[in-house]
Amino acid sequence: MENLSERFNALQDQLMNIYEAAEQTLQAQIKHWQTLRKEAVLLYYAREKGVTRLGYQPVPVKAVSETKAKEAIAMVLQLESLQTSDFAHEPWTLVDTSTETFRSAPEGHFKKGPVPVEVIYDNDPDNANLYTMWTYVYYMDADDKWHKARSGVNHIGIYYLQGTFKNYYVLFADDAKRYGTTGEWEVKVNKDTVFAPVTSSTPPGSPGRQADTDTTAKTPTTSTTAVDSTSRQLTTSKQPQQTETRGRRYGRRPSSKSRRSQTQQRRSRSRHRSRSRSRSRSKSQTHTTWSTTRSRSTSVGKTRALTSRSRSRGRSPSTCRRGGGRSPRRRSRSPSTYSSCTTQRSQRARAESPTTRGARGSRGSRGGSRGGRLRRRGRSSSSSSPAHKRSRGGSAKLRGVSPGEVGGSLRSVSSKHTGRLGRLLEEARDPPVIIVKGAANTLKYFRNRAKIKYTGLFRSFSTTWSWVAGDGTERLGRPRMLISFSSYSQRRDFDEAVRYPKGVDKAYGNLDSL
């Protein structure tokens, strides 16, 4: 008991000497934190032995002493690392190396030169908030190298420069939603207005926000909308003239067209092409061509794929088929329709030459109904849409792959229960990844722990890396690390099972190759 009291009094004397000397050296600050660590360890030991008071000093609970000891150890490690940098000979005070300054925004950095910044919300002087802008910010990169950066303020917030990158540690728009109602604020530095009142929806270049959309910019938008609606009406009224003069088949579609106007436009184009082609046919095929043109123009509205085939083969796929087969939609056919189709086939047979008839016979015209049934089956399967195929019992997983998903996969997927189409769609996608951002040591610890605890839930980890400024070699932002996976299901299982460390952010992505 007496030995603990004597040691505690000796540590108190050392702390008083440090405070009275007020040395502005980094070595004195390291000594100060080492003394605080010894004091916390001594109080922890005394509480563990059941001692509740050392002289006039009450002994706190063990959790408090443990927290203070860990805090002192962390500050000693930071200051010893700073002592090996180029900034060790700068003046450092007790305030500069205190935990309050170290934990204030931007958190985890040493800071000097506080400057008050006043922000007035809603143009109300009583509704103002004070912020601290630090003149200099000392931060460590992924290579444990210290850098000194200047801090600044603009209408977006308070930031410090990492090369040419502005790292904001205070955003005024976030507090404008909390303290204000109109979303407007005014920035003052040393009682001088630096930026006039701006709104939270209009700061240009604000991270995570849209471009300027103030009141003056909204007026032209309204007038443009009115002009667009007027032009849409004029376009609808002049639609027949446009369809006649338009010669290109795949012209650009106007965004304001409705589905009904698009269908009418396709029908008018089909009638125009069918009439121009029917004039160039031979006189012996006049009746056949006219009936084919009528059937072709009628079936245009249903499907474009069948229309293109009927146009190239000179017959309608929905009313008359060569092999006497049935229509894909209607299973029965009236006798009049069957007789008209028989008449048309006989007329075409008389008009065709023997050479054409022989060439067509080589493709399977013999066998009549059987050959027509085979050709009809091939046409219906090729012209049906993927959605129609899936509705017949296909797997819902066989969806199309967007252009952004196409890439080189690292492994060949299994063809079990998917078929050839499902295999191609799965192989078209890019390998998935997860990018994590945080402190370099935290990411390294997370990688080592995941390799042991989550084996089989990932493909590989990358080393920690950082972005580099375009005009220099200085690192920007926090360190990053990539985690690759063999499939999206593996990434989902990994994301559900893993626990990310505190202060680590994640994002999903995919790459063409690894």
Curated annotation (Swiss-Prot):
Entry comment on modification after translation: Phosphorylated.
Family according to the record: Belongs to the papillomaviridae E2 protein family.
InterPro entries with a match to the protein in the record: E2/EBNA1_C_sf (IPR035975), Nucleotide-bd_a/b_plait_sf (IPR012677), Papillomavirus_E2_C (IPR000427), PPV_E2_N (IPR001866), Reg_prot_E2 (IPR033668), Regulatory_protein_E2_N (IPR036050), Regulatory_protein_E2_N_1 (IPR042503), Regulatory_protein_E2_N_2 (IPR042504)
Organism the protein comes from: Human papillomavirus type 5b
Principal subcellular localisation of the protein: host cell
Region (Transactivation domain): 1-201
Annotated stretches, region: Disordered: 196-424
Location(s), subcellular: Host nucleus
Keywords: Activator, DNA replication, DNA-binding, Early protein, Host nucleus, Isopeptide bond, Phosphoprotein, Repressor, Transcription, Transcription regulation, Ubl conjugation
GO cellular-component term (any): host cell nucleus
Ranges of biased composition (kind: Low complexity): 213-231, 285-299, 334-343
Subunit composition and interactions: Binds DNA as homodimer. Interacts with protein E1; this interaction greatly increases E1 DNA-binding activity. Interacts with protein L1; this interaction enhances E2-dependent replication and transcription activation. Interacts with protein L2; this interaction inhibits E2 transcriptional activity but not DNA replication function E2. Interacts with protein E7; this interaction inhibits E7 oncogenic activity. Interacts with host TAF1; this interaction modulates E2-dependent transcriptional regulation. Interacts with host BRD4; this interaction mediates E2 transcriptional activation function.
Record-listed cross-link Glycyl lysine isopeptide (Lys-Gly) (interchain with G-Cter in SUMO), residues: K437
Biological-process GO terms, alphabetical: DNA replication; DNA-templated transcription; regulation of DNA replication; viral DNA genome replication
Function statement: Plays a role in the initiation of viral DNA replication. A dimer of E2 interacts with a dimer of E1 in order to improve specificity of E1 DNA binding activity. Once the complex recognizes and binds DNA at specific sites, the E2 dimer is removed from DNA. E2 also regulates viral transcription through binding to the E2RE response element (5'-ACCNNNNNNGGT-3') present in multiple copies in the regulatory regions of the viral genome. Activates or represses transcription depending on E2RE's position with regards to proximal promoter elements including the TATA-box.
Name this protein carries in UniProt: Regulatory protein E2
HAMAP family cross-referenced by the UniProt entry: PPV_E2
Name of the gene encoding the protein in the UniProt record: E2
Region named DNA-binding domain: 430-514
Biased composition (Basic residues): 248-284, 323-333
Pfam families for the chain: PPV_E2_C (PF00511), PPV_E2_N (PF00508)
Molecular function in Gene Ontology: DNA binding; DNA-binding transcription factor activity; nucleotide binding
